[in-house]
Amino acid sequence: MQAAGHPEPLDSRGSFSLPTMGANVSQDNGTGHNATFSEPLPFLYVLLPAVYSGICAVGLTGNTAVILVILRAPKMKTVTNVFILNLAVADGLFTLVLPVNIAEHLLQYWPFGELLCKLVLAVDHYNIFSSIYFLAVMSVDRYLVVLATVRSRHMPWRTYRGAKVASLCVWLGVTVLVLPFFSFAGVYSNELQVPSCGLSFPWPEQVWFKASRVYTLVLGFVLPVCTICVLYTDLLRRLRAVRLRSGAKALGKARRKVTVLVLVVLAVCLLCWTPFHLASVVALTTDLPQTPLVISMSYVITSLSYANSCLNPFLYAFLDDNFRKNFRSILRC
């Protein structure tokens, strides 16, 4: 399919497609400007597939382990673990399609057709939105739990079934957010008639490109992160103002561990994703020359966001005693 306007490359998180090895290449970098590369970047050709393969192997193994532990261990069927399960599913789905991205880098063209192109880009954006929104829901849950503990109140509405309904709502909401990217995704041919997978925007393509970046930045980062910050700021204010009763302290000890786990997972997520979204701000406000340094930094930032999909299982293993115990019991079976 010939793309309308200037398509954005497959690596839609903000990286630029690898230049063809060996000669001068002029290609669209996803910003609406053609970038000419006078020198190849052979180290990226070798390094990127190795990094992505490591993320894929570790992420797929780790997230599969998380899913199995939560589904098979009765003691792991808690409200918080419902959200962790869905987070693992989202990360696992992304690692499943990462080999396609690796193949595209190695082949230097897109051989898989338009349907798979749309699916890969959709899953990529599912990962962008679902990660932060499930963490936002987990933060809301922690806020309500700690607030109820402070006030020594029970929460009859906080049930395993309710967590499933909330997770379904997140998936439906994320699906709505991802639909525009699925619609604009397609296979196009660049100036060298090499098929590529990317986001194809109509005229004026520069306006559409900036709109897509603002859309992802605001709905995929600013809005949920601001919500999370407001919740935890209010929670800290309340905890300082209210002295816990003795009964609340007893209740809070076990829940404090879960709150710490959620906070650490959230912190790692922000560490991995903030550079990507800051890079989006740079892409929106400046016109950087596509030098080897800029291209390399772009891939580092993108790889960092990819890495978030394989880090969470290690956090659960280090911070959750129940997860470690149940994981060992499954290995013995």
UniProtKB/Swiss-Prot annotation:
Q: Which GO terms describe its biological process?
A: G protein-coupled receptor signaling pathway; neuropeptide signaling pathway
Membrane topology recorded in Swiss-Prot or TrEMBL? Multi-pass membrane protein
Report the principal subcellular site. membrane
Q: Where are the transmembrane segments?
A: 46-69, 81-105, 121-140, 166-185, 212-233, 258-282, 293-307
One GO molecular function term?
A: G protein-coupled opioid receptor activity
What keywords tag this UniProt record?
Cell membrane, Disulfide bond, G-protein coupled receptor, Glycoprotein, Lipoprotein, Membrane, Palmitate, Receptor, Transducer, Transmembrane, Transmembrane helix
Cystine bridges: which residues? C117-C197
Positions of glycan attachment: N24, N29, N34
Q: Which residues lie on this side of the membrane: Cytoplasmic?
A: 70-80, 141-165, 234-257, 308-333
Gene3D superfamilies membership: Rhodopsin 7-helix transmembrane proteins
One GO cellular component term: plasma membrane
Name the InterPro entries for this protein: GPCR_Rhodpsn, GPCR_Rhodpsn_7TM, Neuropept_B/W_rcpt
Effect noted on mutating G92R: In a colorectal cancer sample; somatic mutation
Q: Keyword Cell cycle: yes or no?
A: no
Which subcellular locations apply to this protein?
A: Cell membrane
Has keyword Transferase? no
Tissue distribution is: Detected at high levels in caudate nucleus, hippocampus and amygdala; at moderate levels in the adult brain, thalamus, parietal cortex, pituitary gland, adrenal gland and lymph nodes.
Q: Which PANTHER family match?
A: NEUROPEPTIDES B_W RECEPTOR TYPE 2, NEUROPEPTIDES RECEPTOR
- Family in the record: Belongs to the G-protein coupled receptor 1 family.
This chain's function reads: Interacts specifically with a number of opioid ligands. Receptor for neuropeptides B and W, which may be involved in neuroendocrine system regulation, food intake and the organization of other signals.
Q: What is this protein called?
A: Neuropeptides B/W receptor type 2
Q: Which gene encodes it?
A: NPBWR2
